[in-house]
């Protein structure tokens, strides 16, 4: 029986990660960086000490509860290497999840098997920041896994499941509520697009549809058209969006009860409006996504020409670009 090449690559990735994990545990035998806060908390829960809580911890106990579940199911011990292995297992869940998310965004067929993730998804899973925390006991991996599961479920129309996984993601990082909102919007748009496709196929359908032009063809003049199409689809939108009320209401209740977003150590984690963080994200994503952008069929020069045309192709676009640049500079000055 032939083994799919993606399965071989995925197996090699898993074996390599296990080898790295063993090396890390051999060299770093004591809790490292923030692990002195996370590991004792998890070990307390493993002992059934549910009333223990380290006031220095800033995130909810999702990671520690997951460790208790794995301990109960697989009879794991809550030693440092085993707790770190939790994140290694979560890392190995990333390639299948990313493969299915990519297929969803591209409207492609997903891999036939969970052990046949695409090579691209494996490369993304090895992204240095996420990969580094695969060998330590941190909240990053659990947060990413549940966020991806939320986006995938929402995009496929499983909104109740998406709301549940979204709520679970917030128990790892409470700020994941932003990703829950993104997943909800993405899932609703996917539903609207599927309805539009059905209405186009069925000539006698009078079902209202959202005005949703292609991003590359859209302009500022399309915004009023999009907004004017919303009232007609509002009942459908509410019917689709209601499951997400649960995590949003839960988050709002938490903030009210806690007196803020950060759970503990509030003196060192005061919330503030930091607009340039969005610019950092765009620059960071553009830098690491540049190889993909320049490898497109149209080529680098076509990309440069298209960006130039959209920024300065005509008086209105040039004025808009200058105005946005000014607003960006003002936001950097006042909100850094």
Predicted regions and their residues:
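Transmembrane-helix motifs of polytopic, lipid-linked glycan transferases
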Residues: 85-109
């Amino acid at each position: 029986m032939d083994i799919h090449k993606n399965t071989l690559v995925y197996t090699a990735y898993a074996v390599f990660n296990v080898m790295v994990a063993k090396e890390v545990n051999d060299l770093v035998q004591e809790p490292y960086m923030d692990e002195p806060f996370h590991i004792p908390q998890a070990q307390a829960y493993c002992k059934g000490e549910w009333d223990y809580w380290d006031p220095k911890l800033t995130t909810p106990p999702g990671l520690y509860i997951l460790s208790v579940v794995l301990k109960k199911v697989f009879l794991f011990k809550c030693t440092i290497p085993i707790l770190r292995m939790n994140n290694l297992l979560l890392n190995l869940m990333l390639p299948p999840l990313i493969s299915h998310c990519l297929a969803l965004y591209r409207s492609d067929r997903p891999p036939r098997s969970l052990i046949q993730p695409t090579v691209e998804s494996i490369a993304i899973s090895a992204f240095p920041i996420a990969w580094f925390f695969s060998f330590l006991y941190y909240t990053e991996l659990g947060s990413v896994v549940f966020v991806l599961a939320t986006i995938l479920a929402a995009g496929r129309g499983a909104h109740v499941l998406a709301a549940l996984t979204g709520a679970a993601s917030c128990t790892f990082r409470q700020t994941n509520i932003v990703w829950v909102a993104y997943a909800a919007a993405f899932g609703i748009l996917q539903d609207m697009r599927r309805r539009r496709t059905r209405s186009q196929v069925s000539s006698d359908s009078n079902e209202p549809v959202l005005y949703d032009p292609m991003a590359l063809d859209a302009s500022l003049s399309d915004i009023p058209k999009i907004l004017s199409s919303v009232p007609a689809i509002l009942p459908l939108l509410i019917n689709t969006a209601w499951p997400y009320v649960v995590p949003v209401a839960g988050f709002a209740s938490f903030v009210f009860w806690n007196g803020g977003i950060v759970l503990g150590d509030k003196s060192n984690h005061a919330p503030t409006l930091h607009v340039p963080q969005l610019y950092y994200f765009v620059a960071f994503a553009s830098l690491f996504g540049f190889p993909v952008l320049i490898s497109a069929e149209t080529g680098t020069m076509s990309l440069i020409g298209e960006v130039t045309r959209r920024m300065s192709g005509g008086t209105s676009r040039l004025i808009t670009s200058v105005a946005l640049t000014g607003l960006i500079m003002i936001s950097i000055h006042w909100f850094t």
